[in-house]
Curated annotation (Swiss-Prot):
Protein name stated in the entry: Glucose starvation modulator protein 1
Basic and acidic residues composition-biased segments: 335-352
Domain of life: Eukaryota
Feature: DNA-binding region: 20-48
One GO cellular component term noted in the UniProt record for this chain: nucleus
Known function: Transcription factor which regulates nonfermentable carbon utilization. Binds specifically to 5'-CGGN(8)CGG-3' and 5'-CGGN(9)CGG-3' sequences in the promoter region.
Start and end residues of each PAS domain: 466-538
Family named by the database record: Belongs to the ERT1/acuK family.
Region Disordered, annotated ranges: 325-352
Protein's UniProt keywords contain Metal-binding: yes
GO MF entries: DNA-binding transcription factor activity; DNA-binding transcription factor activity, RNA polymerase II-specific; RNA polymerase II transcription regulatory region sequence-specific DNA binding; sequence-specific DNA binding; zinc ion binding
Record has Zinc as a keyword: yes
Keywords in alphabetical order: DNA-binding, Metal-binding, Nucleus, Sporulation, Transcription, Transcription regulation, Zinc
């Protein structure tokens, strides 16, 4: 219990009106004397003076609104009648200083905060949570507004075309023209003492009149999220879809090849909803060439935009790699289309001429044998050209699947030949679809903020991990082992793998070779579906993902996922079966384990495959 203080001591501890500066700073009890007792005890009596307090700003209470310091203005944009998207309502609060009462003084600063509301047409009175889209602080500048002057809605500042958060669900071409217009507008001098009135310019203003009908369809399905991160993510995913046909008004034109033209007897349960991506690859280049000739000089402007906005170091441009000029999709021209695919495909040697910095894995291992050599020769390491790697990969897959369909034409039974031909085509479509739908969106989201130095660090991490895996292969010398990049390029092959398959070491490591060249069609299709769905970026619910794979598996004989595969708890390895190509042209059934190695960005950089042959007893 606290001891009661005598009355004399209570008088000395009684609070006073104003304390000295020292007692105020130290938060101790001061007295009315000057100097006070606390300052005398510390021999600082000559510095004892009253603490000056700031004067309170009192607002004169008049009954009129114009004398308030806080001015609110609600501006509703006039939205065209053809659009059904939610209208944009902008609430601007101008926090003016109290110098309206004292015009003789110079104001310190002026702060403008603009909020954006999305209000449904059916509920004009209901508001949503505001989000700040622009925050401007102008020092040494005052915007004095007279509330008696009413500002009409046509003079309001429209932020629907704000370049920070552009409107989504638009084509890549329209977004480019929109950003170019905004960039030119930002270069013009702005007024200093007033808000510049702008008109509600649609996003499609840069397009021709012939495309207005298509733009109206886009406006009807316009979606504007309440989060700038959702808008940014949606635009990235939209670019993946629009990158195939950036100059086509309707993406459905590239899918003119219907399921009825290529009937698949074993895939009848899927109906005609399957998209033939092989024809997409063959027709994209020719259609874009026709569009380029009509657009003319505007294409160079868009290329300039790409250099500013796009990410220059990361690319998955797998849909513009076809050099064929024929995009005819009639069934009678299938043989001509396939011959053009074979004639237009480039060999690995021709593709490597475009990459002057290419070093084969065997030559690189001669330079770098230890981790110390890796860091000593770090100046020789450059980011790997994955764009060229995916170009070679697409050429290899088309050569493997489409040439396989041509070879099977010599079969004795015509029905069996036709079924096998369609299965191979469908397998290639399943592979490309799994890359575009499963792998590409996650990969783009993970690499959106990477710079060139990050790619260099990723390559150094890959080479350092490769050295550790090679040392492990020497310890576990009884298992045939092969290591490849996420693009399928082989980086290391153990001696046991050479003994198992019978291939020469120089054949695999002295050039760009892919692991898919040494697997059959069924194993390649299984690998891409399992890798893109489960192995590349990990998985959470194993049973759910496994069931999803089984349901989405192709119904053709050569594309069914092997039922006997299992997972590890950490999501880095999968056990399954495959058919490995031997040097004599035959395939050997093997049990394999695919283990992925990821970097700090959770991006797969290496895949290690271990193979054990399965000998069946007669």
């Amino acid at each position: 219990m606290t001891k009661k203080l005598p009355s004399e001591l209570k008088q000395t501890r009684k609070s006073i009106q104003t304390a000295c500066e020292f007692c105020h700073t130290k938060h101790i009890q001061c007295d009315v004397g000057r100097p006070c007792q606390n300052c005398l005890k510390r021999n600082i009596g000559k510095f004892c003076r009253d603490k000056k307090r700031k004067s309170r700003k009192r607002i004169e209470k008049h009954g009129t609104q114009p004398y308030l310091n806080l001015g609110k203005r609600l501006v509703i944009h006039d939205v065209p009648s053809k659009t059904v998207s939610p209208s944009s309502v902008h609430l601007q609060r101008d926090f003016l200083s109290s110098d309206q009462e004292k015009p003789g003084k110079t104001p310190a600063h002026n702060t403008n905060i603009q909020y954006t509301y999305n209000i449904n047409d059916n509920f004009q009175s209901a508001g949503s949570i505001p989000r700040i889209t622009n925050f401007n602080t102008n020092n040494r500048q005052t915007v004095l507004e007279n509330t008696s002057n009413n500002i009409s809605a046509s003079q309001a500042v429209h932020l629907m075309n704000d370049p920070i958060i552009p409107t989504v669900r638009k084509s890549t071409l329209n977004l480019k023209s929109h950003f170019l217009e905004q960039h030119k507008a930002m270069q013009q001098p702005l007024a200093t003492n007033c808000l510049v009135a702008t008109s509600n310019v649609p996003v499609h203003s840069g397009m021709d009149d012939s495309n207005k009908s298509d733009d109206d369809v886009d406006d009807e399905t316009n979606i504007h999220f309440d989060s700038m991160w959702c808008n940014d993510e949606y635009m990235k995913l939209k670019d993946i879809v629009d990158i195939s046909t950036p100059f086509l008004p309707n993406n459905s034109q590239i899918f003119s090849l219907q399921e009825s033209e290529y009937p698949n007897p074993s895939a009848s349960t899927r109906g005609n909803s399957s998209l033939h991506l092989t024809n997409l690859l063959n027709s994209t280049k020719s259609v874009n060439d026709q569009k380029d000739s009509s657009i003319g000089h505007s294409t160079s402007t868009f290329n300039t935009y790409d250099e500013v906005v796009s990410r220059p170091f990361i690319s998955l441009d797998m849909l513009h790699l076809n050099r064929g000029a024929n995009a005819n999709t009639h069934p009678s021209h299938n043989a001509k289309l396939e011959s053009e695919c074979d004639s237009s495909s480039h060999s690995d040697a021709d593709l490597e001429k475009h990459d002057t910095d290419f070093i084969s894995p065997s030559k690189f291992r001669e330079l770098v044998k230890t981790p110390q050599d890796l860091y000593d020769n770090k100046c020789l390491i450059k980011p790997h050209n994955y764009k060229l790697a995916y170009t070679k990969l697409l050429t290899t897959l088309r050569k493997k699947f489409l040439e396989g369909a041509e070879i099977d034409k010599s079969a004795s039974v015509k029905d069996e030949h036709s079924t096998q031909k369609h299965n191979l085509r469908y397998d290639l479509e399943v592979i490309i679809r799994s890359i575009l739908e499963r792998y590409a969106p996650i990969f783009i989201s993970l690499t959106s903020n990477m710079i060139e130095e990050d790619l260099l660090l990723q390559e150094v991490t890959l080479q350092r991990a490769l050295l550790d895996l090679e040392n492990m292969a020497k310890l576990v010398s009884c298992t045939p082992m092969c290591i490849w990049r996420r693009s399928g390029e082989i980086c290391f092959v153990s001696n046991e793998f050479y003994s198992l398959t019978g291939f020469n070491k120089n054949l695999l490591l002295d050039r760009t070779s892919f692991i898919f060249e040494y697997l059959d069609h069924k194993s390649v299709s299984n690998y891409f579906q399992i890798f893109n769905e489960l192995l590349a970026f990990g998985y959470n619910d194993i049973n759910k993902r496994k069931k999803l794979l089984m349901l989405n598996a192709c119904s053709s004989t050569s594309s069914k996922i092997t039922e006997g595969f299992s997972f590890t708890t950490d999501g880095k390895a999968i056990f399954t079966k495959c058919n490995l190509l031997l040097s004599n042209g035959l395939y050997l059934k093997c049990a394999c384990c695919w283990t992925v190695k990821r970097d700090s960005f959770n991006i797969p950089i290496l895949v290690m495959g271990q193979f054990l042959p399965i000998f069946e007893m007669d």
